[in-house]
Amino acid sequence: MISAQQLTKRFGAQLAVDHLSFEIPGGQIVGFLGPNGAGKSTTLKMLTGMIEPTEGTATICGLDLLRDTLEVKRRIGFVPESGAVFESLTGLEYLEMVGALYGIPEAAARERIRQFIAFFELSFETLTDKLLGAYSKGMRRKVVITAALLHNPPVVFFDEPLDGLDANAAVGFKALIQTLAREGKTIVYSSHILDVVERVCDRVIIIDKGKLIADGRPDQLVAERNAGTLERLFTELTGGAELQQRAENFAKTFRP
């Protein structure tokens, strides 16, 4: 479903993504991990057609990302970390606009919206009576997730999808993406909540300084380095262990 070949992005003299190559088949949930500034968001923006790579290429569902950008966008869903929406619209107006942009018949779009309203336990009155700018962070997140899945895309990218969701909504969301994967959809899941990634993802890709540094099943990668947990493996590979030690030493200065 996703094939990246030597994907590279430069911003002036800064090399943000350094010749990344990987293949992701259908039906797989892949945790896309890295510390802040590693190039995760830049890579996701390239794969979703928001920015063009400086070098390299990628295909989504067999379509060339650069040559067939519009068709690629029709086949993907994307939940960005920022969760940007049109704040001057109600939730229902926004979702109906998204449905129209994807060419979904009005009745079909309204039915899909109702299904997501039920799944996320949203209030239909809230979707119709309040502007998105007045929504809570969690409510807005649910609307953005609904918009990303409304056209039933075969490939979905999530960037920090649990941000703002309460515990019950987060549990439901994790069950949702596992169901989507069983239906053959490709899920790319970027998050800093590593215990969730370890439980939900079939595979993790870890990048640092724009380069791929690990790729495999979470349990296998953890076992190979005798790390115990994915979080510990991540800190060892990305220099977080040194930061953790500095934090522990700093905390000791407060002890009587």
Segments predicted by a language model, with ranges:
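ABC transporter nucleotide-binding domains
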Residues: 2, 9-189, 194-200, 204-208, ...
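ABC ATPase nucleotide-binding domains
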Residues: 219-256
